[in-house]
Amino acid sequence: MTDITPLSGDELNKLVDDFEASEHNRMAMNAVTAAGIDKVARNYDRARLMQRRFSTVVDNGTVTHQDRSGRCWLFSSLNVARFVAKQNMGLKEFEFSQNYAMYYDKLERVNYFLKDVAKLVRAGEPADSRLMQHLLSDVMGDGGQWTMAMNVYKKYGAVPKDLFPETESSKNTGERNVQLRRMLHTAVAHMYADPSAIDAIIADAVAAGHRILTIHLGEPPKSFDWEWTDKDGEFHRDGEITPVEFWKKYVGSADLESYVCLVDDPRQEHVKGKKIGIEHLGNVAGGDPTEYLNVPNQFMKDCVRQILQEQGIPVWFGADCHPMMDRENGAWATDLFEYGRVYGVDFDLDKEQRVRFGDSAMNHAMAFVGVDVDEDGHTTRRWRVENSWGDKIADKGYFTMSDDWFTEYVYEVAVPKALLPAEYLKALEEPATMLPAWDPMGALAK
């Protein structure tokens, strides 16, 4: 027997009567059923103010397209890297191979997951525990973090896109991920069945993961000949070069691997100026751990603005991209849609409540490539964003973000360590407070 009371007939009748008694409800129903909620709720007065003009713009060329995949974190990190590479090679347009980066991220994740789970199995972790079930359900998603991307580039480098192009399975990752997930689930089941054979099970599963990835994505190059003609028409030839050498030569000057990830975790128990991390989150075993320095949102804004204005390079960030997004026109603002007016409902959660009660978390990574500052030189009005959803939407793929939306829905940025004050540099040397694997601060890596 359950003690949850059912919805009674009288209650249902009252709901229907109350709805039909309101002319607003009838008009809203007619409009939304015909046009959809976003078109009906769109705030015209706010939308017309979302101008695409900025006082500082970093030109990064044609917008890339991640297609039907969750590789935003790789695309956005490589978009930062390609800006540096284009400057160093004198190119107007250039793309790194996102397929190459994903190949080695997935291969490393297979190894990381198996050895992480093996430790738990050997320690007696029950197969039906919350932790084990979370790890099993979360395995082989496409998401990731800045630090995880840098771990891949440090170990494997990068290659130009035309030397390891997209495949059907890199653009549409669902089927391949299902097969990898099934293979890993089978391996874990075998570990529980025979713990004495765990090492052999891991070796077989890593080999299987390599086969699956190579069948779907192709075999990545170990070295290649690189030739190009720069924007001034001058021909260049590097000769044979490895992916690691290529990365170091054309991106190494920016020292992206040493960047620090700043987050705005709004929950009061997580103190600003302290490091936090997520248990069991990573890809390259032996690589840098996925840790963040928790700071005020305004400090993140100040860092991004300083980088754009003084260094002139894109800035990687993670956000909850869904709320108040006009995808077609490429705009985010906290009042861009008036859903509450249409429904007669108050959506009054603040940022901390949205995180705590599962309403918001990081789910998309992009790059800031512009900012608009008022005449006073202090007030930021809007931000220009390089997305990775192709150039057929928004301003040829570039989005406009209001400053108040940054406050509410941007959670993370990657910045040079040199921008941090002494107290934050000291905090980086202290151990991180580790949060459980299912904490929302790790959601971008799903």
What label would you give each PLM region?
Residues S8, G36, S97, T242-P243, ...:
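Helix N-terminus capping/helix-initiation residues
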Residues A47-V315, G377, W383, I393-K396, ...:
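Active-site nucleophile-adjacent alpha helix/oxyanion-hole segment immediately C-terminal to the catalytic cysteine
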Residues C72, Y153, R356-G390:
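Catalytic nucleophile-His microenvironment captured as a short glycine-rich beta-strand/loop
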